[in-house]
A protein has these predicted regions:
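Serine-dependent protease modules
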Residues: 1-167, 171
Length: 172
């Protein structure tokens, strides 16, 4: 594939990466740095089944193109059924973690952390009163794909090693 992926780390260093695979049902992808630095540390994933409503969270992303943005809030609800439509107009339901940390266009794919610095989910979508995604913004109802589902899908993508992957895993 002609897809070129560049990853910029917090220190500003850029690295080429390769797409390992994607999952259309969760809109998740796995990439691999081609020549990662030897001191690069992976994030730790929390057990999303142990999350509690009221727990402090921080969402990281690039909303509206503003790099390295962090917003804070709490877990508002667990196992919230969220329906999104994929590129083929198929409806996909994920039992998401609802958070009130501001999520805006550009945050999707970024991590949501707990107070211990562990990933509890991946920012995915927001509830909005806007009629178009161009005017959508945070009203305090954001959703993250739970970390346990993220881990299962990523492990399956890595095991499958196919660029196009459709998960049959259901969120629990």
């Amino acid at each position: 594939s002609d897809l070129q992926i560049q990853v910029t780390l917090a220190n500003g260093n850029m690295y080429s990466a390769t797409l390992v695979g994607t999952d259309t049902t969760t809109d998740l992808a796995v990439i691999k740095l081609d020549n990662p630095p030897s001191d690069l540390k992976a994030v730790e994933f929390a057990d999303s089944d142990k999350l509690a409503v009221g727990e402090n969270v921080m969402a990281i992303g690039n909303p509206l193109g503003y790099d390295d943005t962090a917003t804070t809030g709490i877990v508002s609800a667990l196992n919230r059924p969220v329906t999104v439509t994929d590129d083929n107009n198929n409806e996909i339901v994920t039992n998401a973690v609802q958070i009130d940390a501001a999520i805006n266009p550009g945050n999707s794919g970024g991590p949501t952390f707990n107070a211990a610095g562990q990933v509890i989910g991946i920012n995915s979508s927001i509830a909005s009163t806007a009629t178009s995604s161009d005017s959508a913004g945070s009203i305090g109802i954001g959703f993250a794909i739970p970390s346990n589902l993220v881990k299962r899908v990523a492990d399956e993508i890595i095991k499958d090693r196919s660029e196009e992957h459709t998960s049959e895993l259901q969120s629990q």
